[in-house]
């Protein structure tokens, strides 16, 4: 990706498309996902991710059976360096009827390595309070 914001948008789009290869292409490894309940999972490579971890849409559909896609409601840059940008993300999970099942907040970090940007860390904060 050419910049940090494009990396975030591409990552989000790949999740909505449920496209494994496109999703993995948006990631910089090692990649860590941390959930609101304290679980942290790290994949060292794309193959490691495929072998050991579920794709995000599989996790979402386990708890939200009628999930159709997620809307990106807010993308706010929080901090930046030359090689890393931290974003606050607010998203809504939309069901097959077009209604919002749940709204979440998250922190996504994009990093630049080898001249391209990708997502290296995603923390789902859960429901906003």
Predicted regions and their residues:
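Short, low-complexity N-terminal intrinsically disordered segments enriched in polar/charged residues
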Residues: 1-26, 33
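Surface-exposed coil/turn segments at beta-strand junctions on protein surfaces, enriched
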Residues: 16, 80-82, 112
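A solvent-exposed, acidic/Ser-Thr-rich amphipathic alpha-helical stretch
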Residues: 21-75, 83
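Generic short beta-strand segments
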Residues: 32, 88-94
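Detector for glycine-centered tight turns/loop "hinges" at secondary-structure junctions
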Residues: 38-40, 98, 115
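Hydrophobic/aromatic beta-strand elements that line small-molecule binding cavities or substrate pockets
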Residues: 71-78, 91-93, 105-111, 124
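Short, cysteine-centered beta-strand-loop-beta hairpins and adjacent loop/turn segments enriched
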Residues: 93-101
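Short beta-strand edge/turn micro-motifs at domain boundaries
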Residues: 101-129
């Amino acid at each position: 990706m050419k910049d940090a914001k494009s990396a975030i948008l591409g990552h989000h789009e790949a999740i909505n498309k449920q496209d494994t290869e496109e999703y993995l292409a948006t990631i910089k490894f090692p990649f860590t996902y941390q959930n609101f309940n304290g679980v942290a999972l790290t994949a060292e490579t794309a193959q490691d991710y495929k072998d050991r971890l579920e794709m995000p849409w599989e996790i979402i559909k386990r708890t939200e059976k009628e999930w159709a896609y997620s809307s990106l409601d807010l993308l706010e840059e929080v901090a930046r360096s030359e090689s890393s940008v931290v974003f606050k993300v607010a998203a809504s999970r939309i069901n097959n009827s077009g209604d919002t099942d749940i709204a979440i907040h998250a922190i996504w970090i994009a990093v630049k390595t080898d001249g391209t940007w990708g997502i290296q860390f995603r923390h789902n904060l859960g429901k906003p309070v």
